[in-house]
Amino acid sequence: MSSVKIANKQLGPGYPCYVIAEIGINHNGDIDLAKRLISVAVAAGCDAVKFQKRSVDVVYSAKELEQPRPNPFGDTNGDLKRGLEFGQEDYEEISNFCKQVKIDWFVSPWDEASVDFVEQFNPPVYKIASASLTDDALLQHVRKTGKPVIASTGMSTYAEIDHAIEVLGKENLILMHTTSTYPAKYEQLNLRAIPTMIERYGIPVGYSGHETGIPTTVAAAVLGACCVERHITMDRAMWGSDQAASLEPNGISRLVRDIRLCEQSMGDGVKRVYEEEIPVMKKLRRVGAAA
């Protein structure tokens, strides 16, 4: 199986797990909060941060946008969606800040115009959200950029995944196993799908987690996920639809730490007696006992 290069890092078998801190819309439309979250990801040792980009009037119908929905930005669903979108100056600030603190950044574009907008910043990769996996026009548009693609597969059948791969091609493609509920139930995470998908498709597979807690995402890395993604927040009690299923600063730090400890612990699979074990063996084993 070949690896996929994102920026200066290889993703695939034998390489460290690439950890993505999903900021998404947890910035609540506040660029200063977004930069604080980027700093949290850097301090934790994450490899990248990810945002979401939408052309609101393209992704949502006028009827959807007109729906009453009181929120910090106004009284309608449209006020909310527009309030959560960053524009040109915001993304310039994000791009410059990420360069300054040396962390990769990219987006999940929800429409073709958003791809065109983000291309000016030359992201190292694009992420296809699970909701967009069946959007052939978007997949084709993303593939035309020539950038690597990470495609999430939540709420998708094998037939739908197979078709997406036909559209995207396997070159420089990473699939992501995920369960699209927020927060996801542990019994529905189905982590064994990760090695199953690796065997079925012969390309790198990652994991996007929407569960609470840390151990299951670490388990995904141990099961072979080449990358993992978790939402981050300053405080799970903050306003916002994704905050409750996110990791706070201490949580994302522990996640990265535990994944790296597991990577150190895997070894090469050859059973051996380590030099440090010999004095313990001499002390604890009975003299004359069978080896």
Residue ranges and their predicted role:
Residues 1-291:
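Catalytic cores and adjacent flexible loops of soluble metabolic enzymes
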